[in-house]
């Protein structure tokens, strides 16, 4: 029966090719959507890792060192730096603002850190900012060394380029000295949003708590939670569409082969063998569509303006999902096979 199923697929190859390509496009888009949702976390992790900070110390009650931070004076910096387990400590700041580009504006995320860190990422061109009116800009902004940019209400000179530094769905990051950020965001008041630590403090002064890198990443992606959930809903809908496409083709094939199934039953072929042949068709379609989907995902990903980072687990899970979809999609056709009367084999045309 399996051979008969494969021969039937060969006979209907044009229909199967169209089905495989259509389902493959669905699989490819699902992978891309998965990569988009994961890309938000990948870019946030890249930003946090580039700072070289092991632990962020924030005020108690803060939701994170960046977007969920509570600004506080840096009066306890020396006490935190002197705690056992702390190798280095630096005052850090973070604020969202706008940058003017001619007559238009764009959002940027501003980070403040000492020139030599921790908290200041490595630059691919130029040097790290050392003065309040200097800035290291993300390479995604298209700026060059020596350019002047207007961030918030301040005009800053670009002295360094940080490679591909973005967060919050490709919003570029810019890095100032801590003093520069304080002038930009707090009118020069010595406020910070966190203390970046290299090492692991054994205890902290009262009124403070810590976030590790994972917690810092979660803080950066928190505003994107609704977007990620929306993407997940669309991905689920695409899986349903894939089931409907494969299921409709298998069901039509079953309807067209009712006389064949009746003949098979009349000559004593077990129903389970007939059902296995029909299920095989659905599995072959789904697995070939999965291969097409992987290829299409690689082609489509660079076309998106945001980071598409498809996790390895998604590629590994796709064949399994394809098998499940194939089996689920074949249910309607299998039910039709069970109800076929062998007497139809002896009926008229």
Curated annotation (Swiss-Prot):
InterPro entries xrefs: ABC-4/HrtB_transporter, ABC3_permease_C, MacB_PCD
Ranges where the record places region Disordered: 111-139
Gene Ontology CC: extracellular region; plasma membrane
Chain ranges passing through the membrane: 16-36, 231-251, 284-304, 307-327
Keywords carried by this UniProt record: Cell membrane, Membrane, Transmembrane, Transmembrane helix, Transport
Compositional bias of kind Basic and acidic residues: 124-134
Membrane topology recorded in Swiss-Prot or TrEMBL: Multi-pass membrane protein
Subcellular location: Cell membrane
Assembly mode: The complex is composed of two ATP-binding proteins (Rv0073), two transmembrane proteins (Rv0072) and a solute-binding protein.
Family: Belongs to the ABC-4 integral membrane protein family.
Function: Probably part of an ABC transporter complex. Probably responsible for the translocation of the substrate across the membrane.
Protein's recorded name: Uncharacterized ABC transporter permease Rv0072
Species of provenance: Mycobacterium tuberculosis (strain ATCC 25618 / H37Rv)
């Amino acid at each position: 029966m399996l051979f008969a199923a494969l021969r039937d697929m060969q006979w209907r190859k044009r229909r199967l090719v169209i089905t495989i390509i259509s389902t493959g496009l669905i699989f490819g888009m699902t992978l891309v959507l998965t990569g988009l949702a994961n890309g938000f976390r990948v870019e946030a992790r890249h930003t946090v890792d580039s700072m070289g900070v092991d632990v962020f110390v924030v005020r108690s009650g803060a939701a994170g060192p960046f977007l969920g931070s509570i600004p506080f004076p840096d009066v306890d910096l020396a006490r935190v730096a002197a705690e056992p387990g702390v190798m280095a400590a630096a005052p850090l700041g973070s604020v969202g603002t706008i940058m003017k580009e001619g007559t238009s504006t764009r959002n940027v995320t501003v980070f403040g850190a000492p020139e030599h860190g921790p908290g200041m990422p490595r630059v691919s061109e130029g040097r790290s900012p050392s003065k309040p009116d200097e800035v290291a800009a993300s390479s995604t902004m298209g700026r060059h060394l020596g350019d002047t940019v207007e961030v918030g209400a301040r005009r800053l000179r670009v002295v360094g380029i940080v490679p591909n530094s973005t967060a919050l769905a490709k919003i570029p990051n810019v890095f100032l000295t801590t003093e520069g950020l304080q002038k930009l965001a707090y009118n020069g008041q010595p406020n910070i949003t966190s203390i970046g630590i290299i090492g692991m403090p054994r205890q902290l002064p009262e009124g403070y708590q810590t976030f590790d890198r994972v917690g810092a990443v979660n803080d950066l992606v928190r505003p994107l939670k609704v977007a990620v959930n929306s993407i997940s809903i669309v991905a689920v809908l695409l899986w349903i569409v894939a089931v409907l496409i494969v299921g409709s083709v298998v069901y039509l094939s079953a309807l067209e082969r009712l006389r064949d199934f009746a003949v098979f039953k009349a000559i004593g072929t077990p129903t389970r063998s007939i059902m296995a042949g029909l299920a095989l068709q659905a599995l072959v379609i789904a697995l070939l569509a999965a291969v097409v989907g992987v290829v299409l995902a690689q082609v489509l990903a660079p076309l998106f303006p945001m980071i598409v980072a498809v996790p390895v687990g998604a590629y590994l899970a796709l064949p399994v999902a394809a098998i499940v979809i194939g089996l689920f999609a074949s249910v309607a056709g299998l039910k039709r096979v069970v109800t076929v009367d062998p007497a139809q084999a002896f009926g008229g045309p």
